Amino acid sequence: MTRLRPAYAAALVAVAVTALISHLRPTPYNNFVLLAQALLHGRAWIDWPGPYIDALNFGGRYYVIEAPLPAFLLLPFVAVFGAQTNQTALAVVLAGVAVGAAWELGERFGLRNSANAWICAFLLAGTDLLWCAALGDVWFIAHVSAVCFTMLALVELAGKRRGWLVALFAACAFESRFSMIAALPVYAYLLTCHLERSVPNERSEGRSAKSEGEGRTTTQPLVSFAVVLGGVGVLWMLYNFARWGTWSDIGYTTWYHQDQAGMPTGSPFRFSYLPNELWSFFVQQPTRLAGFPWLRPEFSGVAITWTSPALVLAVLARSPIRWVIALWVAALLVAVPNVLYYVNGFAQFGMRHALDFEPFLVALMMLAVRDRFPRWGYVLIAYSCLVGLWGCWYWLTFVRT
């Protein structure tokens, strides 16, 4: 009997947990189902059901401004089930794949199974990943998809380093959340490093750096990486032209000009928004109540300081130095647009925008605990997971009933 690979088992457990918590309830904010229906009819504008669906009124028609990858993933299901397609179910599956990929990354980094289980549990429940997947709304499934494909890109970079596949996963990530495009220079850097120096663990299932790297020049992966990204860029410009009549994407800027929280001119990314974003990410607390349930997470969120303190494990990562530096740079690059944006992710539990850079921090956490897992790390992960589960319970009990 063939033994199930641990990464697949981790993915199945994550799917089961997320499905159990979400009850696979369809989200009313199924913008990607509407977009998939539109694409199947050969158009970019959606049949707008009403104001509860965020869509940009442009030229008398309504358009989804979010990155479209989840809609493309839904195409075969929408072709069969139409408007009844359950967008939340896709979010649940993507969360499972993200956790499975994380487990595989942990193996390639040389983690013990017990340490890997703790880190993967943190990725699912200790961040906003579980909450986003359980609800499955248009904004939330985008985060889940971005985490999923970012983890897959990191797995490939820690393995065979096929440039075209890294580019494909990276494109899927930034076509889920646009901010993920900021990680591309880091991926390119890791592709150009000599393979035997870039893979942290050379003992993992025969994937030794030496055997895979012999005879391969450092430029070959980068060429295929660039070719795939170039093709994606052409398709992206065509999609923009179909929506806006221009090759560039003006969706978010136009939305910002129409939004009550925005401004009639200028960019949605400004240094003037930095103080509020930093307060949101690191200070904002839930409101204390006199009675049950004692705490109320406001719609504006709760800082990762209180929801995901186990992220501090990332600062312990020391080697391999190229990976440590690359992952920190990726996290910082991806964080920049999020800390300059005009809104902090409202409505949410925790700080959902942190999911854009948390995959890189989770990878750093893995490197940090390869040799020794500090006892306080277990405590912080357990706390983070309990807070994440509590957040799911609160929202499904009091908000999304």
Language model segments and positions:
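Long, distal/terminal scaffolding or interaction modules
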Residues: 200-201
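Membrane-proximal envelope and lipid/glycan-remodeling enzymes
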Residues: 1-197, 206, 212-401
